[in-house]
Amino acid sequence: MLFVGNSLTATNDLPATVAALARGAGRRPVEYATVAPGGVNLEDHWNLTGARDALLAGPWDVVVLQQGPSSLPESQENLRTWATTWADLARAHGIRPALLTVWPETERSYAFPAVVQSYRAASVAARATLLPAGPAWLAAWRRSPKLRLYGPDGFHPSVLGTTLAALVVYTRLTGTPPSAIPLPYRAPTARILRRAAADALR
C-alpha cells in the first residue's frame, strides 16, 4: 500500500496505524511506503516526481491519495484534475487508486460539507475508491461531540483522529467490518470509533 499525501497523512503516521490495525486483528500484514512531505498537494507530488517513482517501483495493490481540504472552487477543480491524473497512472500499472477525504481546520469547520463534496466529486471523476475519514469524524462527533479528533493546532489529527482515519482506510480497502477490528481504547471510545467508521462507509 503506497500513501501519497502530506502532513495530514504523516502526523501520527497514518500508514503505520493502518498496519497496526491489521496486526491487531490477526490479518494479513500490510506492507506500505509513504511519500508525505508537509504542505504539498497532488499536483506538487506529480511535479516533484518522488511519489511517481515510488508508485512505479511497486509492486503495490493500492495507492492512497490525499491532499488538503480542497473546499474552495479552484481547489476542488485542482483535486479533481490531479486525483484523476494519479488514478489513471495507477490503473495503468495495475494499482487500485483510493482517495482519502480529510477535514478542514477548526476555524473553518463551516467548510466541512464542501470538503466532503469536493472529495466525493473527485473520487467519481477519478474512478477512485473513496475513503471517507472526514465523514467518519463527523459521525463520531454526532455520538460524542467532545471527542478530541483534532490535535493541538486545530488542523492535524490527534492520535484518536488518526486511528479513526486508519480504521476507515483499512476496513474500506479490505472489506473487513469495523466491528471486527480491535482498537487500543476503552470500550465506549472504541465503540464510537467503530460505529462512526461504519456510518461513513455506508
What are the residue ranges of the model-derived segments?
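Alpha-helical cap/lid subdomain in secreted, periplasmic
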Residues: 52-163, 167-172, 176-182
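Generic detection of long, well-ordered alpha-helical segments
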Residues: 8-11, 109, 187
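Conserved SGNH/GDSL esterase-like catalytic core that processes O-acyl groups on lipids
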Residues: 1-2, 8-81, 91
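Generic signature of intrinsically disordered, low-complexity, basic-rich segments
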Residues: 6, 124, 192-196
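Long, well-structured alpha-helical subdomains associated
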Residues: 181-202
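A short, amphipathic alpha-helical segment
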Residues: 19, 23, 170, 174, ...
